[in-house]
Amino acid sequence: MKILVIDDEPVVLNSCRKVLEEDGFDVYLVPSADKALKAMKRGGIDLLLVDVKMPKHDGIYLMQKVKEQWPDVPIIVMSGYPTPDTITDGDKMGAAAFIAKPFTPDELLETIRQVIKKEVYHGKK
C-alpha cells in the first residue's frame, strides 16, 4: 500500500516515514498541497495523511482537490490544533479519520488499519 504524507514539518514527515516503512508501507513524503497534487497525478497512491495547517494551501483545500479528482482515495487528517471546527471541516470534506498531533506510532498505525479495514469492508479497495 502506498501512503502519501503531506506536512510542512520535516520532523513529522520523517517520523511518519520511519513508522510506516517499518510496518511495510510504501511511503511518499511531500511538504505542501501543491506537491501532493503533483504526486497524486503520477498515480498509485492508496491513502493520504494530510496536515491541516500548512502555508499557502491548507489541508482542507488539498482534501477538496483530491476528492474532486480521486474520490475513492481515503484521507486521514492530522492536526496539532484539533478544534471542533477542524474536525467538522474534515468530516465535510470526506475525511476517513482524524488523528491529533502529537500521536504515537501505535496510534498512527491503528488509525491507518481502521481506515483500510473500513475501505475493504465497503468494497473500495
Roles of regions detected by a PLM:
Residues 31-32, 58-62:
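Acidic catalytic/metal-coordinating carboxylates
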Residues 10-28:
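Two-component/phosphorelay signaling modules centered on CheY-like receiver
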Residues 43-49:
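Active-site beta3 strand of CheY-like receiver
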Residues 9, 52-53:
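The short loop immediately C-terminal to the conserved phospho-acceptor aspartate in CheY-like receiver
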Residues 61, 82-97, 110:
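Alpha4 helix (beta4-alpha4-beta5 surface) of REC/receiver domains from two-component response regulators
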Residues 13, 55, 83:
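The feature encodes the CheY-like receiver
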Residues 38, 60-71:
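Short amphipathic alpha-helix used as the core "switch/output" element in two-component signaling
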